[in-house]
Design a protein with these regions (language model features):
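N-terminal membrane-targeting/pre-transmembrane regions
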Residues: 2-17, 121, 128-141, 146-202, ...
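Alpha-helical transmembrane segments
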Residues: 24-32, 62-77, 134-152
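Active-site and channel-lining beta-strand-loop segments
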Residues: 38-70
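Hydrophobic alpha-helical segments
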Residues: 81-133
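Transmembrane helix interruption/hinge and helix-loop junction motifs
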Residues: 203-212
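Conserved beta-hairpin
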Residues: 215-256
């Protein structure tokens, strides 16, 4: 059984989430098709050849035909949109991963469609493409529209309900009193990287608005676990990074302290990881990792989690969860 997929042979409400399919796949590709159709409709108003490449300051320095430009647009955009969109809509993946990946589809499509508009609008009715300067207005509009669509769809995503755990955790696991909420900050190296990324992103605005947008949007994945807060409540274990999740207490089967090494587990952030060397725990998990270090394994009847916590707190958090589960199961 693949615990990353929540152990379901088939999701009770279907394999796909309809709202996500529409917002992450259908709507973006429909918008892309509309932009491509508009581009073909204004072909007669464009110079021949058209400007297809621009220098650092936005001046045209490469030329080609409209058909080739649209083919490249479709060849680059559609596969990326399908990969991100379908991953975001597939119910077999936990909601937190779908919220991370799915919105990237409308954002990317909006950016690429905006780039086409920014390329062609300055050339409408121009006798020649020489001297044309690339705009950036439509790239920002397309990106903002895609971001709004992606965010709205991400908010309404749902996880199929996992069954309740049938018994209390193994008696050998730690028990303890109620724990305090904790916060884990990323490593110094990642803080330096984030600061450098911000500096480069701001500087790129002077060179290329398109590069600024790409770097700015990528920043989400750099800092999505910059700071992670976790607390144990009577009804759920709740954590929050840039996005968060609640793990219902009734679905938890065990909590135990462990360690997370980003070098062995695919990095930091929110990701699917696998620990083939752990006896009895070879299945995939969702890691919420701001750095390497002490972590908390939370096993459930659905998705399993590994959440990095401040050093010295994993035992107390695991003990609190297991003690609450003992009381829950009487």
């Amino acid at each position: 059984m693949d615990r990353l997929t929540t152990g379901r042979g088939g999701a009770p409400n279907g394999r796909w989430e309809v709202a996500a399919l529409f917002g992450f796949v259908v709507a973006p590709l429909t918008g892309l098709a509309a932009v491509a159709a508009w581009a073909k409709s204004v072909r007669s108003r464009l110079p021949e050849p058209i400007a297809t490449h621009f220098g650092a300051r936005g001046e045209a320095d490469g030329f080609g035909d409209l058909s080739g430009t649209l083919v490249i647009l479709v060849a680059v955009t559609v596969p990326m949109a399908l990969v991100m969109g379908l991953l975001g809509a597939r119910r077999r993946f936990p909601r937190i991963l779908r919220r991370s990946l799915g919105p990237g589809s409308p954002v990317f499509v909006g950016f690429m469609a905006g780039m086409i508009a920014d390329t062609l609008v300055p050339q409408l009715d121009a006798p020649t493409a020489d001297g044309v300067v690339l705009q950036s207005t439509w790239s920002f509009v397309g990106t903002a529209t895609g971001l709004a669509v992606g965010a709205m769809v991400a908010i309404v995503l749902k996880d199929p309900s996992a069954p309740k755990a049938e018994s209390a955790p193994d008696p050998s696991l730690p028990r303890g009193p109620r724990s305090e909420p904790v916060r884990t900050d990323t490593s110094t190296g990642m803080k330096i990287l984030a600061a450098a990324w911000i500096a480069v992103t701001v500087a790129s605005l002077l060179l290329s608005p398109a590069l600024f947008l790409i770097l700015g949007l990528s920043f989400f994945y750099i800092v999505q676990t910059y700071s992670v807060r976790l607390r144990v409540d009577d009804d759920a274990v709740r954590f929050r990074a840039l996005i968060g999740e609640s793990i219902p207490l009734a679905t938890i089967t065990a909590a135990k302290p462990t360690r997370y090494d980003w070098g062995d587990s695919g990095g930091i952030g929110i990701r699917g990881v696998e620990y083939p060397g752990r006896p009895g725990n070879e299945a995939k998990r969702i890691a919420v990792a701001s750095r390497s270090g002490e972590a908390l394994d939370i096993d459930t009847t659905g998705t399993n989690w590994t959440i990095v916590v401040p050093d010295g707190t994993a035992d107390a958090l695991a003990g609190d969860i297991n003690a609450r589960l003992d009381r829950l199961h009487g």
